[in-house]
Curated annotation (Swiss-Prot):
Residues 120-242 form the MPN domain. Coiled coil: none annotated. Zn(2+) binds at residues 191, 193, 204. It comes from Acinetobacter baylyi (strain ATCC 33305 / BD413 / ADP1). This is UPF0758 protein ACIAD3126. GO terms for biological process: proteolysis.
Amino acid sequence: MSFSNQNYNVHTFIIMNQSIKFWPEQERPRERLLHSGPESLSDAELLAIFLRTGSKQHSAVELARLMIQHFGGLNPVFDASLQELSHFHGIGTTKYAHLMAVKELGRRYLNHYFHQDALNLNSSRLVLDYLRYELLGEKQEVFAVLCLDSELRKLNFKKLFYGSLNACNISINHTLRYALQQHACHIVIAHNHPFGKAEPSAADLDLTHQLYQACQLVEIKLLDHFIIAKDGTFSFAERALLSQKKCMHTDIDKPDLTGEDHHKKSCDRSP
């Protein structure tokens, strides 16, 4: 390492560990946010704005960075308990209250946005954001249906089937009855993998193809099937897997909407 690099690293270390009020103005998170927008800040810098102050050992930014590294991300920081956060010097009841208030404000903002009347979900990104909001917090596998009108506005959303950590028993007939009751022109189905990867199983592929065929028979369009997991998402439509016959069963009879056609994907139905 050259002497100039050593000087740079020492300078950076001193800057990061002293109080933010002594930093050059262009390096302070709050000033950078006002000048360049919040998207220009790192997770640690955004978190530092809410922490406001650090500890005797660390600036607010360095404290925020240590917290994110310890918990493995920004979301786990906000999910941590007061007892867990208080292990960090400089974090007490006041800062914990600030973080919980920010988390609750964010939750209320999203809740208001996603539950407005006739929410327009006319892009796969909007649909995916909505489904992540609804399903990411679930601790067991859940199968859900999003019903849309002809202009891709939300009619209703329901978590139809609940299962164990990694399995869920799904009725195609029950799913179609619900979509017809909502007068849906389009539907998007989704399920989560609470502790697994966002990758489809053979049963997922089989279910998707059968439901795609069944929807065609009742003139409802299945737009996509999403798998939601903490490590990412999977779209059947993006992989051209909605109608492809890469499944165990490729032909189904016209659905009996009065029967109970269960598909193995093993659980209790939601009320």
